[in-house]
């Protein structure tokens, strides 16, 4: 059986062919099986965020492959699009992920792009908001009026609302207090089950 995610000889170079060329990831290979937790640790600027942006097709490798259930996610446009729904990514900085006028619309963005009915979108928004600890009273507020920790929770809810098979978190507890950290980490464990 193929690994859920397999990275084969992945390299990514920024600004290739310019004086600013930088190899962010070089010849990396690993696999992640269904149900497995994987942590990636490294110092600032070591390529962690670049690496994880490849796992759902936000970045295209300079060389190498990303396989999802044995299929190269860059095989064709349809496969790339589907991989973005199957592999959810919560950014390190929620401000990079939030852009809608209301919290509700931000959480609903992914399910709406999946072509789901309004009823299913609402169900998913409410379920994901509850999962991430986003109070219903915040759903009609602007995400830009929220605290850092609340923005983080909205960003997580927006990904969870798509019900991806794989969820990748880039520093999921940044901006949360100790109780918030414990809550989110517990919810991540629950989602994995």
Annotate each predicted stretch with a short phrase.
Residues 163:
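Conserved catalytic motifs of ABC-family nucleotide-binding domains
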Residues 142-146, 150:
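Conserved ABC ATPase signature
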Residues 16, 65-82:
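ABC ATPase NBD Q-loop/coupling interface
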Residues 167-170:
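Catalytic Walker B motif of ABC-type/P-loop ATPase nucleotide-binding domains
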Residues 41-43:
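The feature captures the beta-strand-to-loop junction immediately N-terminal to the Walker
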Residues 119-137:
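Conserved ABC ATPase "signature" region
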Residues 56:
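Helix-to-loop junction immediately C-terminal to a conserved catalytic motif
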């Amino acid at each position: 059986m193929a690994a859920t995610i397999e990275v084969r000889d992945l390299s990514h170079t920024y600004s290739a062919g310019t004086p600013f060329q930088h190899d962010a990831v070089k010849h990396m290979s690993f696999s992640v099986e269904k149900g497995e937790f994987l942590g990636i640790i490294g110092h600032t600027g070591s390529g962690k965020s670049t690496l994880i942006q490849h796992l759902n097709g936000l970045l295209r490798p300079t060389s190498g492959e990303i396989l999802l259930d044995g299929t190269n996610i860059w095989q064709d446009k349809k496969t790339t699009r589907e991989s973005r729904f199957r592999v959810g990514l919560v950014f390190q900085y929620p401000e990079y992920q939030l852009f809608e006028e209301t919290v509700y619309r931000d959480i609903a963005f992914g399910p709406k792009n999946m072509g789901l009915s309004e009823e299913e979108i609402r169900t998913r928004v409410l379920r994901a908001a509850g999962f991430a600890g986003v109070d219903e009273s915040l759903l009609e507020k602007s995400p830009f009026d929220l605290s850092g920790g609340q923005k983080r929770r909205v960003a997580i809810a927006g990904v969870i609302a798509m019900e991806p098979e794989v969820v990748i978190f880039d520093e999921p507890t940044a901006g949360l207090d100790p109780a918030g950290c414990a809550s989110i980490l517990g919810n991540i464990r629950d989602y994995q089950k």
